[in-house]
Amino acid sequence: MAEPFPAEGLPLAEALARVLADLTPLEGAVRLPLADCLGRVSAEPCQATASVPGFRAAILDGYAIAGEPVPQPGDRWRVVGRSAPGAPFSGALAPGQAIRILTGAPLPELGGRVLPQELVTREDDTLTLLRETSANPWIRAADEEAAAGQELVGAGRRLGPADLARLASCGVASLRVRPQPRLGLLISGDELVPPGQPRDPGTIWESNGTLLEALLTRLGQRVAQRRVVADDPEALGEALEALAQTCEVVVSTGGVSAGDADWIRPLLAQRGDVAFWKLFLKPGRPFAYGRIGGRPFFGLPGNPVAAAITALQLLWPALQRLEGSTPEPLPRLQVRLAAPFKRGSGRPELARARLRVTATGELLAEVDGSQASSRIGSLGGADLLLEIPAELGSLERGQLLWAQLLRLPIF
């Protein structure tokens, strides 16, 4: 079969560019309650309908006084009322008057300053300033969170906890979001046995489906269907086409290398289209991208670490594009190797490593002892993917490298 790409495989950056160029965002939008919008992508801008909080409020507990010059120690006021959250003082303050005010409570008319309670003493209704106060009035502006008409979120934003909280604080109860692609996941292999079932010699418990579905769920995506199929070309072909009929994206793991039982790539060529095959990358060389039934198809390697890493590098950005957001790569930072690392040169490598911060703030990478792409446990302790160029072989302690941080934004 003719291959329109280098025999050693495509560089990762070129492969990603080809994938993204082949995709356009899914059409449409759906309105969801705010509680269901976490991780979804906004379909349109949302503006504040009113200023928030909508009134001037005390930043701390104390006493509100009229907007007179900065008071001096020994100044006195008569306490005429109280303002609490949900129970504001209804009158206006005159010079020489004060009201007790709690954090978050509205300031009364003509109230221009809050005196922190630590700076005053009160006897009956007489308030006395004990020490100098700052020029800070300790007042939250009426439009501190948002002004009426201000954009709260723009179109194409992936919504986090802070976005949802801000929208809620501005009275927004629901939002129009972009549709999410339904993912169809196909796991292939004669050797696979469901977890919990007895297995014969030479078989393994199937874990790639669990790994990928959990990873995609952590990334805010949803696997609509998950199938495990033996290495039978007819059954695999039917499963691929069935997934393409009900899902917007089809993902497989295993069967994309060049072995006698690797049927996925030839089936894709027969029943769909192969855009490219093989990556110039370790781990993750056996990788296929194309179309099946008109749907984007991602053929991930069968080794679990390679499947997870290629999913992060290529599938995750593609899903972001389909949702209508700008694909955001994992954060990158520079680190130094904490110890020598031996490897064979020839392919660029994404090596799992732990991040250690020294007492002086230096960032060190501790490479996991085994970089075998079949070793699932090496993913659990990894904080970083070290970006090792193809031309570098054995690396010395202190070698400076770029690394991808395996952490998602919190807010």
Name each model feature, range by range.
Residues 16, 30-35, 39, 44, ...:
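Flexible glycine/proline-rich
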Residues 56-58, 69-72, 90-94, 107-109, ...:
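Solvent-exposed alpha-helices and their adjacent loops that cap or buttress functional pockets
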Residues 2-13, 31, 63-230, 369-370, ...:
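Short, glycine/charged-enriched hinge/interface segments at domain edges or termini
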Residues 7-74, 350:
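Intrinsically disordered, low-complexity, positively charged segments
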Residues 1-13, 175-300, 304-310:
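Helix-rich terminal scaffold detector
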